[in-house]
Regions:
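Short, basic/low-complexity N-terminal boundary segments at the transition from targeting/disordered tails
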Residues: 1-18, 77, 108-109
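Acidic, low-complexity intrinsically disordered segments
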Residues: 55-115
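Amphipathic, interaction-prone secondary-structure segments
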Residues: 10-48
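Intrinsically disordered, low-complexity segments enriched in small/polar residues
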Residues: 12-14, 22-26, 53, 89-91, ...
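A short linear-motif detector with a strong N-terminal bias
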Residues: 8-11, 32, 74-75, 82
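Intrinsic-disorder/low-complexity loop/linker signature
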Residues: 1, 15, 36, 49, ...
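Short linear sequence motifs
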Residues: 14, 36, 54-55, 72
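Short, surface-exposed linear segments at secondary-structure transitions and domain or protein termini
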Residues: 47-57
Length: 115
């Protein structure tokens, strides 16, 4: 992702979860770490207006792969998307979610895009 080629860690205020990034060319890994769990998800660069596509565990595999309850999936994915936008974009950005991917796009969120 833009901004850095070295592994980096970013943390929200307080002792909340952290994301760290391992970057290698057109793809890499995002590590989510909290006091309860840690897991890796992959990403790769995309075609505009998308910047990056992040692969996420499907609902049926979520708890086994992340050790986070299914009830917390939406909030966890929103945190990841918001933090990637904050850490890696220099301007506006928004996220689109589906069962297997988070797509991070540059610019303002169009009125026709649904979460």
């Amino acid at each position: 992702m833009p901004k850095s080629r070295q592994p980096t860690a970013h943390q929200t205020a307080g002792s909340g979860p952290q994301l760290s990034y391992s970057e290698g060319g057109r793809s890499g890994t995002i590590r989510y770490t909290s006091s309860e769990t840690s897991f890796d998800i992959w990403y790769e660069f995309a075609m505009p207006p998308a910047l990056v596509i992040i692969g996420i565990p499907e609902s049926r595999y979520w708890e086994a792969q992340t050790k986070i309850s299914l009830a917390q999936r939406k909030d966890t994915l929103q945190f990841i998307a918001d933090q990637v936008i904050k850490d890696k974009l220099t301007g506006d950005g928004y996220a689109q979610f589906d069962e297997q991917f988070i797509t991070i796009c540059t610019g303002k969120k169009p009125a026709t895009v649904y979460d």
